[in-house]
Amino acid sequence: MIDFNQFPSPCYIMEEELLRKNLCLIKNVADRAGVEIILAFKSFAMWRSFPIFREYIDHSTASSVYEARLALEEFGSKAHTYSPAYTEQDFPEIMRCSSHITFNSMQQFERFYPMVVAEGSGISCGIRVNPEYSEVETELYNPCAPGTRFGITADLLPDVLPQGIEGFHCHCHCESSSYELERTLEHLEAKFSRCFPQIKWLNLGGGHLMTRKDYDTEHLITLLQGLKARHPHLRIILEPGSAFTWQTGVLTSEVVDIA
């Protein structure tokens, strides 16, 4: 039993044993499925815990210049970075801190890819794609809702990809099950698999809550193994956030006044 009186208030308290249990499960999924699973900072960025994470995973994903710096300077490896848009001011620092950079549009890719080439460190570039399918019920949070500007739809993607696009990024889940991922993959492959021979990696984004008690991890592993079998040249990446720290701690507080 934790003695909460020993901690300041308010305070986030993480239980290392519970964190390691989640990390072991995630590493087991990654190893058995033959994929890479990385940490999304937008969900969790308690940097003092990063040495524990590094025992189980190698990389993280960033959505801003500061998260990219956190990846390099505290997590100890360069980030897989995606942002809806980059600026001339931030992009040099983004490049310094990133091994992968995903662009939200062809316009962004065309604007910044020459800088990647000139920088010369071998950053792998990708483009976000929109499968026009998501089971997120709240439209405000649905990245594939009508009129969304997140990613490129299949009709706007050329049959021959521009030189320099090495990967696709697809994110349309939120605390989702493996069965939602299965249905998403059906749409993703139907719309974009014609381009898969031209790319090296496929990032399936976050929202895969594989540490939830009712999550079917065996189905997830089978699903990812099947995807790898159909496209053996592709490096498959998942970047969950909440799954890593699901039910691993609490926020303590105290009542200081009652009117």
Show the residue positions of the predicted features.
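Short amphipathic alpha-helical/adjacent loop interface patches that line ligand
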Residues: 23
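C-terminal active-site-proximal or functional interface alpha/beta core segments in diverse enzymes
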Residues: 176-259
